[in-house]
Structures are given as structure tokens and as C-alpha cells.
Amino acid sequence: MILSSEREVAKAAFLKTHGFGDVRRESLGGDASTRSYERLHRAKNADEDGSSFIFMDQPPSVETAPCPPGATPEERAALGYNALARLAAGRVDAFVACAGWLNAQGLSAPKVLAANPAIGLAVLEDLGDDLYARLIETGIDEAPLYDAAIDGLLALHAAPTPDVLSFGGSTWPLLTYDDLALKTAHDIFIEWQPKFRDLTFDEAALAEWEAIWAPIRNTGEAGATVFCHRDYHAENLIWLPERQGAARVGLLDFQDAVLAHPAWDLSMLLHDARRTVSPERETASLERYLAARPELDRTAFLADYHALGALNIIRILGIFARLVTRDGKPRYADFIPRLWVYLEVCFADPALADLKAWFDQYVPAEARR
């Protein structure tokens, strides 16, 4: 790993090489990952218009390796969590390739202005600060924002999906959110929730857990037909009202994209861990999506949405438990009660009766907070 002083030298050299040596740098902090961001400001004068840019810093070799195409389950297990889950391991080449593909579809990912994936640095178009989450907190009418977000998903789901994404000299495979990745997703819960809430799952509980999830995973992999952003929620969407159609939604944090079931990103949007999406908003958004896709079997799709939504919520519960207990980030505990509310709504689907019964038996009410 590059030491901080060495990293700063590398960052300054990168900026100078690509014509950004004279900018003012403003730290924007990081997120739950190993990335950090800065806003670069150019002074406004006769030669410059005072533009701003985003500087992304993802140090190489910080995370475990991503999943090579064709890797066996055993090889993925040996490589670690990112390979099991088919995450991009923060690789800048994944971001560059995904951004280029998204923009080519007429969507609004940040344009990549300069990048060196080998050292994990990139300068990006600045899409501004109008995150969905921030705007909604001000009391703005959220309906147009969610309608546009659904339109963005419809555009994504209508786009042809290549095996490999390519842009600006960077390539990245669009892998399937397969059985092993989905199993890794729901098993985060049984690994980390016991440490967070002092639970114990015996062999019988774990055997029942696997039997319940196997057919749901099969649904997820069999239905993996669309480009999946994988983190499509209000903290990663920027409102760009001056643009048209689906391009009004600025997209961030999409480098972990996979080929997945279309219900997955709907769950990310409507089961938002960081802000409450009302049942009315959820219903209106689902209706907008289904109205635009009359070829779908409505009943079957909603069943898939509830099942894969439950898997997604349980995955996030496990991730937040890990962030709190392993990584010392207690603020993520504040989001957990909201996730349990979403999960109870999914449990209302009779097809998930066995999953609901498992939680009723092994996760008492006092642990669901």
C-alpha cells in the first residue's frame, strides 16, 4: 500500500500531468468504501471559466481481488470477498468502462476527463451537489425525482448488454450476479448479525436458511438479463433538471455493475437504507415501471421483487452489522430499524412465508432494531 506522503506526491504529479496542476483542491471525504474524493476548482479569469471537477482517489491493492471471468467457486473463495460477491474491488478501470458505457446509452454518468487506473486516480465531470437525498430533505416534491429514477432504470433495462464494457482504453467484464454471489450476499447476515445482536444460529437453522434461499437465488440468476447499477439509491443519484429524459438522473458509484434481475435496482431505490421511502411512493414507482413494461407478468415480477428485495435488505443488514462491529462505524446502526420495516413488508408476500417463519423462530423481535 502506498504511504500517505507518497500518495500525495503521486496525486500531485497526476494532476500536473493532465493539466490540473493549478487547481484549488477541496476535500469531499469518502464513503463506506476505500475511495475518497476532492473537488478541483479552477480560478475564474480571462482564460478560465471557473469550472470545477471531481478527483477520485482509489488506492490500488487496498481491497481483495475482483472476480476473474470464468473463475471457479473454489478460486473465488481463495481470492476473497470481492471475488465471491463479484464486486469490482474499487478498480478505477471498472469505473471508467462503466461510465463510458452509461454515457453511450444517453444516461448521465460523470464524463472521465483523465484517468490512470494503474495508480487508482481519475478526474471526472462534476455533476454538482443536488443529490436526491439532499433535495428530498429540503421538502422538494419527490415525485418527479422518483419518476425520473424509474425512467433511468427503464432506459438501463432496455439497453443491450455486452459481455465486456470498454471505454478510454479501460475494459471491464459485465459478470452475472450468479448463485454464488447471491449466496454471499445473504450469508453476510448470518455471519455478522450474530456479532451485532448476540444471536446464535445452529446447524438446523443454517440448513433451513440454505433451503429457503436456494430457489430465490435460482430466480435471481435465471432472471439476470439487465445492466444492474447495484447501488441505485438517493445518495448516488443527482438531479439534473436541465437535461432531458433519463439523462436528468446523474449516476454515481456504479463500478460494481453486474448483469442481474431487473428487480434488484428497484429494490435498491425503493428499499433505501438511508431514508424512508413511503409505501405510497414505492407503489407509484412500481406502477410506473410495470406500466412501461407490459410484456412482464405483473404477479410474477412483484413476487420476484419481494423475494430479491428481501435478499437485498438482508444483505444490507449484514453489511451494516459488519461496518458497526468490525469497522467501528456506529452511525450505520441508525439505518438498521428502517431496514427491518422494509423487510416486514416483503414478508407480507405469502410466497415468503417460510422466510418469515425462519426469522420469527431465530431472530426475536428485540433483535430487529
Short names for language-model regions:
Residues 187-197, 259-296, 310-327, 339-347:
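Active-site activation/catalytic loop segments of kinase-like enzymes and analogous catalytic loops
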Residues 15-23, 105-107, 295-297:
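Short secondary-structure junctions
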Residues 20-43:
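ATP-binding glycine-rich phosphate-binding loop
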Residues 1-24:
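Juxta-kinase regulatory segment immediately upstream of eukaryotic protein kinase catalytic domains
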